Amino acid sequence: MSRFDTLFANLKAKNEGAFVPFVTLCDPDFDRSFEIIETLIANGADALELGFPFSDPLLDGSVIQAANKRALDGGYSTDACFEMIAKIRSKYPEIPIGLLLCANLVFVPTQCVFFNRCAESGVDAVLIADVPVLASEEFTQAAKKHGIQSVFICPPNADQVTIERIANLTEGYTYLVSRSGVTSAENQAHAKNLDNLIESLKRSNSAPILQGFGIAKPAQVKEALALGCDGAISGSAIVKIIERNLDSQTQLLSELAKFVSVMKAATKS
């Protein structure tokens, strides 16, 4: 089984959900970013969703856009990101690692080169935010060739045909978007039809469902699990902690540890 498959099987046996934090790699720099990831894992992160710095992140709101800019301003590239992933994998051989990024970062080195680097560094799954399921065949084939699981977003307006395509192609986990728009910890609303979407995904035998966008409080994690999700992803809330503590790594790591601990605790019944 893959690391994600093993994780969800183990959590199901314990009647727990998954808490998955998102951060942009190399924000605010390489060494501090690695310490941030160590803190996430030490305080209960079940898996990691990692972004590569990019100049035009399509799904991201202002908070994660700023994280991308900090990393880019520091001169950090895709090479540095793969170097960090290899370092994470060396220290944490069991933690599932997923990437969330834009197609440009996959196309530029060629898909074969990109997914080969993913495999070599220890990536488990890749979600390409701006590639819809209908246009995904060449990506999924390249990923599969290198043993990388393909993850797709299920939007809140997905019809049954789209849901079935997502369920058929997605491996590792299904990213259920809480609402339309971009990432934000402030906008914590979610679409009214999420329960129906979750039921439809499960009827279509989808990969385990993680709800993302606007997840910033333990109550929202509990709500996602109550709706039938297998866990929740939190990104903007975590990146905001980084942003407001750029002058104190000690305070940053302390605040981050507390946040992750309470969010993970919310996954336990």
UniProtKB/Swiss-Prot annotation:
Q: Quote the InterPro entries the UniProt record gives.
A: Aldolase_TIM, RibuloseP-bd_barrel, Trp_synthase_alpha_AS, Trp_synthase_suA
Q: Which Gene3D superfamilies match?
A: Aldolase class I (3.20.20.70)
Reaction catalysis annotation: (1S,2R)-1-C-(indol-3-yl)glycerol 3-phosphate + L-serine = D-glyceraldehyde 3-phosphate + L-tryptophan + H2O
User: Which keywords accompany this UniProt record?
Assistant: Amino-acid biosynthesis, Aromatic amino acid biosynthesis, Lyase, Tryptophan biosynthesis
Q: What is its EC number?
A: 4.2.1.20
Coiled-coil ranges per the record? none
Its GO CC terms are:
cytosol
Record's PROSITE patterns? TRP_SYNTHASE_ALPHA
Which pathway, metabolic or otherwise, does it act in? Amino-acid biosynthesis; L-tryptophan biosynthesis; L-tryptophan from chorismate: step 5/5
Family recorded in the similarity comment: Belongs to the TrpA family.
PANTHER family, sorted: TRYPTOPHAN SYNTHASE ALPHA CHAIN, CHLOROPLASTIC, TRYPTOPHAN SYNTHASE, ALPHA CHAIN
Summarize the subunit comment: Tetramer of two alpha and two beta chains.
What name does UniProt use for this protein?
Answer: Tryptophan synthase alpha chain
Q: Which organism is it from?
A: Actinobacillus pleuropneumoniae serotype 7 (strain AP76)
